[in-house]
């Protein structure tokens, strides 16, 4: 699936950002505590768009590490190897808005590495 276009619309009262329109998707807010991280993982049946809700996140994507700023978007195509973490010095959890696109269930995850014994 191609990455959906993010639409920014200015209004007299402010603005809104639209991430999906009339698309089957699952929307979550991921919260990762300081010094913690999710499994290094990939998915076969879903693409994901992550939007940083505040600073402090650390994202690994296909061998590269980045620290997205609040509002920054990251596209995770199906099959990409990725993980979310939170810098130990962040002082607060990292939160990511996750929009998953595709036909899948929660078993659509291949854990490649996991600090909690689930790989």
Predicted regions and their residues:
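A short glycine-rich, His/Asp/Glu-containing loop-to-beta-strand
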Residues: 4-42, 46-47
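Hydrophobic/aromatic beta-strand elements that line small-molecule binding cavities or substrate pockets
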Residues: 30, 49, 71-72, 82-84
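Conserved strand-loop elements at the edges of beta-sheets that form or border functional pockets
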Residues: 21, 42-44, 51, 70, ...
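Glycine-centered loop/turn positions within well-structured domains
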Residues: 38, 47, 57, 66, ...
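Double-stranded beta-helix
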Residues: 2-11, 83-119
């Amino acid at each position: 699936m191609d990455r959906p276009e993010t639409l920014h619309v200015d209004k007299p009262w402010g603005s809104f950002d639209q991430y999906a329109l009339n698309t089957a998707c699952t929307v979550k807010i991921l919260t990762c505590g300081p010094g913690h991280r999710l499994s290094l993982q990939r998915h076969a049946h879903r693409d994901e768009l992550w939007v940083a809700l505040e600073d402090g996140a650390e994202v690994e994507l296909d061998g590269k590490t980045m620290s997205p700023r609040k509002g920054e978007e990251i596209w995770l195509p199906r099959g990409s190897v990725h993980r979310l973490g939170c810098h130990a010095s962040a002082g607060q959890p990292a939160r990511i808005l996750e929009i998953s696109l595709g036909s899948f269930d929660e078993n659509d995850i291949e854990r490649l590495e996991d600090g909690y014994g689930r790989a």
